[in-house]
A protein has these predicted regions:
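Acidic, serine/threonine-rich low-complexity disordered tracts
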Residues: 1-33, 74-156
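Hydrophobic, well-structured mid-protein blocks that either form specific transmembrane helices
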Residues: 23-63
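Short, polar/charged, low-complexity connector loops/linkers at domain or secondary-structure junctions
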Residues: 64-74
C-alpha cells in the first residue's frame, strides 16, 4: 500500500506498507513513514533516514511519477528519482531503450520500453494508458516476475 500527495508539483510518498508472503509465510513486513516537510523518513518505527530530495518516492509511487514526467517530457531519455525501501534511500534511473509494439489480450499497444538497472527491471509505458506501465518485467537472481495491466479506467 502506498499513500502520497503532491507538494510543490512533485509527487511525494508519505506512507508505504509492504508485506510479502511466500508459501504462507511472511517474508517481509515493512512500514515506512515519510515526512517530506521535515526531510526524514522512518522505517518500522526504528531507523531514521534523512531525505535529500524535493520528492522521495516508494517502490509503487515511482511509477506514477515516471508516468507524469514522461507526459511532460516525452523526448527525455533518462528520468532519475530518490526511492525509499527497507534498505534506505537510493537513486533510481529509468532509461528509454526503444519503441515497441506489444500485445495484451490480443490488442496491439504502442509503447516506450524503459530500463531501470537499479531495480533490475524493464517496463513498457503506453500513451494510450497515460504512460502508466502496461508491462513490468523484473528479473532477480532467483525469480522472474511479469506484471501486466489488466484494467484501466481513466478518472473524469
Amino acid at each position: 500500500r502506498s499513500i502520497g500527495l503532491k507538494i510543490d508539483n512533485y509527487i511525494n510518498s508519505q506512507y508505504y506498507d509492504l508485506v510479502e508472503i511466500s508459501k504462507g509465510k511472511i517474508e517481509k513486513n515493512n512500514k515506512i513513514r515519510i515526512y517530506p516537510d521535515k526531510n526524514y523518513a522512518i522505517i518500522n518505527s526504528e531507523k531514521r533516514w534523512e531525505t535529500i530530495s524535493k520528492s522521495t518516492l516508494d517502490e509503487l509511487s515511482v511509477y506514477l511519477a515516471l508516468a507524469e514526467d514522461v507526459q511532460k517530457n516525452p523526448n527525455q531519455d533518462v528520468f532519475t528519482y530518490q526511492v525509499i525501501d527497507e534498505k534506505g534511500i537510493n537513486q533510481v534511473n529509468f532509461k528509454f531503450e526503444n519503441y515497441e509494439t506489444i500485445i495484451i489480450n490480443n490488442i496491439e499497444i504502442e509503447s516506450m520500453k524503459m530500463i531501470s538497472p537499479e531495480l533490475e527491471l524493464s517496463l513498457n509505458l503506453s500513451k494510450a494508458f497515460n504512460f502508466l506501465p502496461v508491462i513490468i518485467n523484473r528479473v532477480n537472481k532467483k525469480n522472474h516476475y511479469q506484471l501486466t495491466l489488466s484494467q484501466f479506467k481513466e478518472l473524469p
